[in-house]
Amino acid sequence: MLTLHLVFLYVFNRILILIYIITVAETKYIFVTGGVVSSLGKGIISSSIGKLLQARGYNITIQKFDPYINIDPGTLNPYEHGECYVTVDGMETDLDLGHYERFTGIQTTKANSLTTGRIYKAVIDKERRGDYLGKTIQVVPHITDEIKRNVKSLGQKYHYDFVITEIGGTIGDIESAPFMEAIRQLKWELGKNAINIHLTYVPYLRAAGELKTKPTQHSVKELQSVGIQPDVLILRTEKHLEEPVLKKVANFCNVDLDCVIQSEDLPSIYEVPINMQNQGLDTAILRKMGEPIGEKPSLGPWRAFLERRNNAKDTVNIGLVGKYDLQDAYKSIRESLSHAGTYNDRKVNITFINSEYLTEDNVAEKLKGQDGILICPGFGQRGIEGKIVAAHYCRTHNIPTFGICLGMQMMVIEFARNVLGYADANSREMDEKTPHNVIDIMEEQKNITNMGGTMRLGAYECVLRQGSRVFDIYKKEHIQERHRHRYEFNNDFQKEYERAGMQCVGRNPESDLVEIVEIPGMKWYIGTQFHPEYQSTVLHPHPLFVNFIKAAIAQKSNK
């Protein structure tokens, strides 16, 4: 009885502690801003901070505030904005959320991505409902209050220890002004539970042989002018900064010397967390926020990944067939290939092949030397025929081929034209009058007129056919993958495809939508309607990409 009593007291005590942690423990907020120029890597720094705090046992999340007026980046041109990243709950977001997930392994949601457009829409909707009781709606306090609500609600709802918020753009931008005011207010209200980390640029003037700190000083001055004193400065630089430079920045910017961190150019973005840890960024954050420092985490699995990556000597060549030559347009695909290369002990050389200029006359030359071909996702007519040409060449030459979303659809169309004998086969997206619409618009999409946020988005279940190649790759029957599409494989043609050798080996159990096609007799010829690149992380590479690279390595060995 005494033992049972002691056990009961122990369990009761643990429950009380848990309740205390959940209800009383305060969420800490870290705001990451940028100055001097854009594209300094705030997303990588935010991801690295998240990784370092996570390694210390903290429950973290990272959110991105984009100051543009679009509701989301779903309809933005990839040339302007890069890749549109899709969260598990179907939100179209900035590509930085991909970095957050790949570094930390967390799953982001709609709450992790916010734009000025969504903020204003929420406020206007409230005004129309009468929530403000006839008050004049202004940037301060109504817009800033809505921003603050979105910051704090994320931490309060899910009881995170740390919420890291990256503010897009640079200090001084007109679009960022409401966000900066909201941060100023939050820092005042939350005290030591909120800090600002400001990322700036220290240029090197080659002609003079000097590093210039003046842009950083002006950037901090601009930040101070809106009422925000940075707690930590991170200096992006091409050259190593000696201590006198760091002391100068600390002195003129009112920041502790040990809170001035330099971020040199590194061979890989995945080395940034180690670099930040070596300079004590995580300990500076914890000290500023009144948290215990504890022991320095080893980051063992992360270091093992980097060691394996750096030790890889052999290479494998992968051709990306797409129409956007901006690297960021296929960011998640490139990173997924890189992860898969590391876990196959190979460096992946990626060559972009513009499908707009790919023809039957030059395809052999353009694809020469590639060990595997990935046909990229996309939308619209431009570059489509080039993707079909690539699919035909790869299929007839038995080259490992991976088609994603539109890439898979082009593999299906090519097969219909050249194997099934339907020379006019096409997608309804490209040709509404084609009699052989092997790719058709989804039934639920037919009456939708708005473009933004209306596709089949987010994670859906897929059931794999036992005995198929993809079943062997995943090693399970039921999977979940993320989607972003309006068009689908037309099931009216399924029997013809399967009789001719292209198998439909993955299906959604509710809608019967074909998710995966493969040709079993080939070395590796797989197309997916979903986007597997959204689920590949540093420590958990996606099995399809790992197996694809493995097939490409075998292809290279057999040449």
Please describe what each predicted stretch is.
Residues 20-346, 355-372, 379-380, 386-393, ...:
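Flexible phosphate-sensing "switch/lid" loops adjacent to ATP/NTP-binding sites
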Residues 457-461, 465-559:
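C-terminal and late-domain segments of enzyme folds
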Residues 295-296, 344-349, 507, 558-559:
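Flexible, glycine/charged-enriched surface loops at secondary-structure junctions
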Residues 40-43, 47-51, 55, 366-461, ...:
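Cysteine-nucleophile active-site neighborhood
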Residues 80-88, 266-270, 375, 396-402, ...:
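Short beta-alpha connecting loops at secondary-structure transitions
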Residues 6-9, 16:
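Short hydrophobic targeting helices and cationic amphipathic motifs
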